Amino acid sequence: MASPRELTQNPLKKIWMPYSNGRPALHASQRGVCMTNCPTLIVMVGLPARGKTYISKKLTRYLNWIGVPTREFNVGQYRRDMVKTYKSFEFFLPDNEEGLKIRKQCALAALNDVRKFLSEEGGHVAVFDATNTTRERRAMIFNFGEQNGYKTFFVESICVDPEVIAANIVQVKLGSPDYVNRDSDEATEDFMRRIECYENSYESLDEEQDRDLSYIKIMDVGQSYVVNRVADHIQSRIVYYLMNIHVTPRSIYLCRHGESELNLKGRIGGDPGLSPRGREFSKHLAQFISDQNIKDLKVWTSQMKRTIQTAEALSVPYEQWKVLNEIDAGVCEEMTYEEIQDHYPLEFALRDQDKYRYRYPKGESYEDLVQRLEPVIMELERQENVLVICHQAVMRCLLAYFLDKAAEELPYLKCPLHTVLKLTPVAYGCKVESIFLNVAAVNTHRDRPQNVDISRPSEEALVTVPAHQ
């Protein structure tokens, strides 16, 4: 029996790993998040204007945010790339042989790209966004998944509420490239005829005929659900997420606590109280929220003194969430960047090399923070109007989710003090309004310096540190 290998600690993530032939051996857990032992193919099902693309985009954004490499494949976009000008609904008529041929070619081209992404490029989840309304088409896609070793999960969106369908048409389809420069009434009429082209051949997922498939059916954007044969952890995460999202119009307000005493001194972390300007900001925030006249607003804070002091000025009930606490800087808590460079120059350089994955000694990384904040995202998706009073790193993670930012961008998103970000979900994304509340504050944003080498001189390591007392 071979003797156990020696262990060494990864300097970036602080994870113990085997040491072999004088070098650390790369273990699967160091390569990235892996929640399934084989890739997953998510297949959308449903008539046009049922919110399939909305669901596809949200699901893709969520999975990428939690660290699961995911890509959306929209067959409609493949069709637009192949047929440069859209004329009318007649392209979708079931007896239009040329249209049928082109649409099949587009589906096959998309599936070929799915295969490349999942089998060659390291993808974990592909979302195949098309109508897929016939049992024959779904069987073809399922067989494609079987042949390539993928687990297939169907997501069907059924909608019979005419108001919801009409709203989908107005919101999404009239902004579609198919209807650029077309009269609104004419576009609506054409799109309704396009839906009719699919209705006669539409075969919904059936509890008897499709009992061996893994799927979720979503009725009228979340009024009820049918879930069948959830096969693994990633599918259960997908189901849980889809059962939490809604389309009710609302806004989410994100802001940091008022300026703290440690912000003034350029010290990170800790649990300080507000500075005089921070207390002034909390009064301005109270006035701003009052002026907005927001219906049924919920207010959330962390369990740290500075966010609670900020919320107290609002004179409204608020909930304290421990998971909203600032990133734990471990041994670097309450230090200035200059002190970190002086005491831990290697750590300071490693953090600049990969700020998202770098974990402070005895502390956290941004990657850890994202995992910690997932319950907050789930609850934000369930809620309507919410104000979250949090911290710089936490706000960056939440903002990255709503704005679909990559992990490399996330730690450098600008979240200045005394500024409220109003996020309003729209058709396929999020509208952002930045509102500065006219109270001066120190700058706490540090850009990545050009030189991130571990042997760099101190002045080059500290070149982007903001001014402080």
From Swiss-Prot:
Record comment: activity regulation: The most important regulatory mechanism of these opposing activities is by phosphorylation and dephosphorylation of the enzyme.
Positions annotated to bind ATP: 46-54, 168-173, 348-351, 392-396, 428
Keywords: ATP-binding, Hydrolase, Kinase, Multifunctional enzyme, Nucleotide-binding, Phosphoprotein, Transferase
Annotated SMART domains: PGAM
InterPro entries: 6Pfruct_kin, 6Phosfructo_kin, His_Pase_superF_clade-1, His_PPase_superfam, P-loop_NTPase, PG/BPGM_mutase_AS
SUPFAM superfamilies: P-loop containing nucleoside triphosphate hydrolases, Phosphoglycerate mutase-like
Residue segments, region 6-phosphofructo-2-kinase: 1-249
Tissues expressed in: Testis.
Binding residues for beta-D-fructose 2,6-bisphosphate: 256, 263, 269, 306, 337, 351, 355, 366, 392, 396
Subunit comment: Homodimer.
Protein name in the entry: 6-phosphofructo-2-kinase/fructose-2,6-bisphosphatase 4
Origin species: Rattus norvegicus (Rat)
Phylogenetic lineage: Eukaryota, Metazoa, Chordata, Craniata, Vertebrata
